Amino acid sequence: MKGETPVNSTMSIGQARKMVEQLKIEASLCRIKVSKAAADLMTYCDAHACEDPLITPVPTSENPFREKKFFCALL
């Protein structure tokens, strides 16, 4: 740390304190295994599949974006 000004060392101490606080927060988080998280996600998706319009299509009569059918008549 030769040639370093006191301001820079103070800033690095402040940054180190912030990092320590962040690491303490992350260490205290409750973690679960990826396999359990994936299983929970699949269970949730299966339970809510009937409510998902991308899986269960909206009935044509209720679809506001359906194509309008135009009939041409020759006079």
UniProtKB/Swiss-Prot annotation:
Give the propeptide segment as residue ranges.
Answer: 73-75
InterPro entries documented for this protein: G-protein_gamma-like_dom, GGL_sf, Gprotein-gamma
Cell compartments where the protein resides:
Cell membrane
Q: In which tissues is it expressed?
A: Abundantly expressed in brain. Low levels in testis.
* Residues with lipid group (S-geranylgeranyl cysteine): 72
Q: Which domain of life is it from?
A: Eukaryota
- UniProt keywords, alphabetically: Cell membrane, Lipoprotein, Membrane, Methylation, Phosphoprotein, Prenylation, Transducer
Query: Which CDD domains does this entry report, sorted A to Z?
Result: GGL
Q: Which residues carry this modification: Phosphoserine?
A: 9, 12
Any GO CC annotation of this UniProt entry: synapse
> Which sequence positions carry the modification called Phosphothreonine?
5, 10
Q: In the UniProt record, does the keyword Acyltransferase occur? A: no
Where are the Cysteine methyl ester modifications? 72
Q: Which GO terms describe its molecular function?
A: G-protein beta-subunit binding; GTPase activity
Pfam families in the record = G-gamma (PF00631)
What is the membrane topology noted in the UniProt record heading this document? Lipid-anchor
* SMART domains listed in its UniProt record: G_gamma, GGL
Q: Which family does it belong to?
A: Belongs to the G protein gamma family.
On assembly, the entry states: G proteins are composed of 3 units, alpha, beta and gamma. Forms a complex with GNAO1 and GNB1. Interacts with SCN8A.
Q: What does this protein do?
A: Guanine nucleotide-binding proteins (G proteins) are involved as a modulator or transducer in various transmembrane signaling systems. The beta and gamma chains are required for the GTPase activity, for replacement of GDP by GTP, and for G protein-effector interaction.
Q: This chain belongs to which protein, by name?
A: Guanine nucleotide-binding protein G(I)/G(S)/G(O) subunit gamma-3
